[in-house]
Design a protein with these regions (language model features):
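Phosphate- and other anionic-substrate recognition elements at nucleic-acid/protein interfaces
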Residues: 2-13, 17-142
Length: 142
């Protein structure tokens, strides 16, 4: 493959009860970046619009787990979303990825970036950064 060949993107989801953070790779699937934060009840529609304009290879969705590895209370909602996506879009696989500690890492990243306390309290920003961390971790382990 030529180094300048455009590849389909990979999307990462930090699925929340109210809000969901999204991140996406660049066209070469090398660099992840924050995409958006959407209200969770609008996520499916948002992704359907996105795939109409961008080629997407797969979706990585954070699996909410407790520190001991057991599923958290949000896992059922994540599984429900995964199943709905698979039925509607079998051509774009969705796979779970351990998201333990991504919120902590997101806050640490924001501190290291020099963001002020007010910016770090922006939950939508934390969600996008968390999704970016999920995607970066996925890319580094594939």
């Amino acid at each position: 493959m030529a180094s300048d060949e455009v590849m389909p993107r990979i999307i990462a989801i930090d699925y929340g009860k109210k809000r969901t953070g999204l991140a996406v790779t660049d066209e070469l699937q090398i660099v992840p970046g924050a995409l958006d934060t959407v209200e969770t009840h609008r996520l499916f529609e948002y992704l359907e619009k996105y795939i109409q304009s961008e080629s997407v290879e797969r979706i990585i969705i954070g699996e909410p787990r407790q520190s001991n590895g057991m599923p958290s209370e949000n896992m059922a909602r994540v599984r429900e979303f995964e199943n709905r996506w698979r039925k509607a879009h079998p051509e774009i696989p969705i796979e779970g990825y351990d998201e333990r500690f991504t919120s902590v890492l997101a806050h640490r990243t924001m501190i290291d970036a020099g963001l002020h306390k007010k910016a770090r309290q922006d939950k939508a920003l934390v969600d996008k950064v968390s999704a970016t961390i999920i995607l970066q971790d996925y890319l580094s382990h594939r």
